[in-house]
Amino acid sequence: MGNTSSERAALERQAGHKTPRRDSSGGAKDGDRPKILMDSPEDADIFHSEEIKAPEKEEFLAWQHDLEANDKAPAQARPTVFRWTGGGKEVYLSGSFNNWSKLPLTRSQNNFVAILDLPEGEHQYKFFVDGQWTHDPSEPIVTSQLGTVNNIIQVKKTDFEVFDALMVDSQKCSDVSELSSSPPGPYHQEPYMSKPEERFKAPPILPPHLLQVILNKDTGISCDPALLPEPNHVMLNHLYALSIKDGVMVLSATHRYKKKYVTTLLYKPI
């Protein structure tokens, strides 16, 4: 004898089980679906999968990198002198500032010199002298974990404060915008015309004190023939010439060395 529908419903309520109703498609109703907690950490992956986070993360990191790059001011290059005094025929310079590539040094007497513009900070370098790597023992050195010894140099901004101040002063002094490029007054383009009287003008008269030169004086009998009288100071550093006699021209010049006077005579045949 079968149970009625009312009896089956009472038995199901007592057992605490309720059969969900299904629609024509075979799925449960929307009201019977499990609820998802939006703030639950277990459910975070449902809304933020790796496929969605990867592009956003890369875009954020790229934006942050650009922001940091803009905030950092580029280090100013400073002229730095490298000098090798250990002799040699061919000397090269290599360092961390040029990926350890060889840079030839210029010979300056007994030394080899190079001037490079390096950014501020710490730099390591080494010399390549006649086919052998070496360092300068007179300069600061640093030893790596592999035992390699390199020279080290610190390029500091404070070492160039004097040069920066001089540069600022020179820039201020070079501002000549308020000055005129030419003297004031009228200008014209007429060519200069020499006058006939200026073309045939006689040379100026010789000053009288230049007439008393040593070549025109006779040496006294009481004087030493190897010594000449002391000349006047206005006669120094001038070139004098005697009248041509017997086909010979005599030139003379007097110079002073400390307390002595030296007169040179040049005899030239004509």
From Swiss-Prot:
Where on the tree of life does the source sit, at the highest rank? Eukaryota
User: Where does the record place the region Glycogen-binding domain?
Assistant: 68-163
Provide the alphabetized UniProt keywords. Fatty acid biosynthesis, Fatty acid metabolism, Lipid biosynthesis, Lipid metabolism, Lipoprotein, Myristate, Phosphoprotein
Segments carrying the region annotation (Disordered) are 1-44
Q: Which Pfam families match?
A: AMPK1_CBM, AMPKBI
Post-translational changes noted in the entry: Phosphorylated when associated with the catalytic subunit (PRKAA1 or PRKAA2). Phosphorylated by ULK1; leading to negatively regulate AMPK activity and suggesting the existence of a regulatory feedback loop between ULK1 and AMPK.
An annotated Gene Ontology molecular function: protein kinase binding
Q: Which residues carry this modification: N6-succinyllysine?
A: 201
N-myristoyl glycine lipidation: where? Answer: 2
* Role, per record: Non-catalytic subunit of AMP-activated protein kinase (AMPK), an energy sensor protein kinase that plays a key role in regulating cellular energy metabolism. In response to reduction of intracellular ATP levels, AMPK activates energy-producing pathways and inhibits energy-consuming processes: inhibits protein, carbohydrate and lipid biosynthesis, as well as cell growth and proliferation. AMPK acts via direct phosphorylation of metabolic enzymes, and by longer-term effects via phosphorylation of transcription regulators.
What does the record say about domains? The glycogen-binding domain may target AMPK to glycogen so that other factors like glycogen-bound debranching enzyme or protein phosphatases can directly affect AMPK activity.
According to UniProt, the name of this protein is: 5'-AMP-activated protein kinase subunit beta-1
